[in-house]
Structures are given as structure tokens and as C-alpha cells.
Amino acid sequence: MERSVFYISDGTAITAEVLGHAVLSQFPVKATTFTLPFVESATRAQEVCEKINEIYRETGVRPLVFYSIISPEVRELIQHSEGFCQDIVQALVAPLQGELGVSPQPVLNRTHGLTESNLGKYDARIAAIDYALAHDDGISLRNLDQAQVILLGVSRCGKTPTSLYLAMQFGIRAANYPFIADDMDNLQLPAALKPFQHKLFGLTINPERLAAIREERRENSRYASLRQCRMEVGEVEALFRKNQIRYLNSTNYSVEEISTKILDILGMSRRMF
């Protein structure tokens, strides 16, 4: 089943995308998506409606429209398009208003925009991103006392994207350190990491998956051979066990899932909002 899907917002459209995708993922739908942020005026809304209506005329199938818009005028224009329109935030606001006994006070861009109340947390996330970049792949072992978690693992097991996701999404200062082929003859925990053992967390991966990932980077190399990958993974997992370092097999998990599992296992709190 194929459908055109619109994510529309008067802000970044991140909320519409996340909630809309979460709902749509429950159905066997192949989606052609259109993300339209900052639909703040009637003129812009009319343009969006024309696009929705054009697709309906061409296909004969109503596009699915997930939107989050504060302006009643803009919202009404979207609702009168030829799409199947779902106001994803209002569907939750109405029952919550009844429970709380107070009226909502919507403010444009409050969710993902900068406000006085969230500026400090935004700055913390930027600082966490800077930290992750400065401490990626063992570039620097200085200031590890400032890290909240230090990820360890073989090359290409997911350390860098996980570190950056932890920083961007949760404001977590994450460093990461790679174990490379040259380390394998006498693999030990580096002395610089030992004082921070309580912050260490290992990532591992199935050798077959690791070989496939490395093959894309260095085709037909020793680095990408299944034999090399099996050896490295085995040695590093043994190191984790010897040093009682908690670790996770990342093979079947997305970066989002890996990050969330790390926070859960380590008992770390999120800083999203």
C-alpha cells in the first residue's frame, strides 16, 4: 500500500514527524513523505493545500496529513484540503484540558524553539555536542572527568553515532575510544581510562555484520575480513568481561535504541526538555 504523507507545522515539524511516523509505523504503508515546517501564514497554508489537492487529483487517493498548528485560521485551511487530516497535538490537548481543569496557552515554536525556560538546556546540549566531537574515536583523553559515559568498542560498531545522538538528543557528554587491530596482540584497558571505570560502557557487534559494514569502507581488505572481525570482537568482549565493563550488542538496534538502552542500563536521566 502506497500513500503520500504530509508532516506540517508552524514550527520545525519535528513533533508532527515523530508522532505521525509513530502512528503510521503500525500499518503496512509505503510512504512518500513531504515535511513542511514553518507554515505560519494563510498564504503559505494555501500553497500547502494546493500541493495536497494536486496529489489527490493525480492519484485519486487522499494524502495522509499530520499537522501541528496553533493559528486557527491556518489550521482551518489545512483541514479543508483534500487530505485525511489529523491534528496530532489537539487530539491530546482536549482530554488533558479536561483532566487539568485549565485551558492551554499555546505559544508558537515553544516545543523546539528557544525560550527563556529552555535556553540553559539548549546550551547544555550544544556543549555536549562539542564535547562528543572533541572526544570522538580517542582523539583526546583529556577532561574525561567531565564525561558522563565513555563508550568502548571495535572500529565501526556504532560508537560515534551513539555518542553524538546522546549529546544531541539528551545533552549527555559522551566520549568514545576505539580498539584497533594493532591493539589485539596485547589488548588491555588503557591506563587513562582506568580511573573512570564506572563511566565505561562497551558496544559490541556480530562479526558478520561488522564485516559487511567494513567492506563498504575498505573493500577486500584484511580490516574487513570475517576472520579479522571475529578475532577483534572476541578479544574486545573478553576485555569487557575481564574488567567487568557492561556492554551491549548493537547489531539489531538503531542508534536511538542503543542510546536509550545505555541510559537505562547505567541509570542515567534524560535531559530532553
UniProtKB/Swiss-Prot annotation:
Record-listed ADP binding positions: 153-160
Biological processes annotated in GO: regulation of DNA-templated transcription
Keyword Coiled coil: no
Coiled coil: none
Catalytic activity, reaction form: [pyruvate, water dikinase] + ADP = [pyruvate, water dikinase]-phosphate + AMP + H(+); [pyruvate, water dikinase]-phosphate + phosphate + H(+) = [pyruvate, water dikinase] + diphosphate
InterPro entries: Kinase-pyrophosphorylase, PSRP, TF_DNA-bd_sf
Entry's Gene Ontology molecular function annotations: ADP binding; ATP binding; DNA binding; phosphotransferase activity, phosphate group as acceptor; protein serine/threonine kinase activity
EC number(s) stated in the UniProt entry for this protein: 2.7.11.33, 2.7.4.28
The entry's keywords: Kinase, Nucleotide-binding, Serine/threonine-protein kinase, Transferase
Family matches, as PANTHER family: PYRUVATE, PHOSPHATE DIKINASE REGULATORY PROTEIN 1, CHLOROPLASTIC (PTHR31756:SF3)
Family under the similarity heading: Belongs to the pyruvate, phosphate/water dikinase regulatory protein family. PSRP subfamily.
Function in brief: Bifunctional serine/threonine kinase and phosphorylase involved in the regulation of the phosphoenolpyruvate synthase (PEPS) by catalyzing its phosphorylation/dephosphorylation.
Designated name of the protein: Putative phosphoenolpyruvate synthase regulatory protein
The species this protein was found in: Yersinia enterocolitica serotype O:8 / biotype 1B (strain NCTC 13174 / 8081)
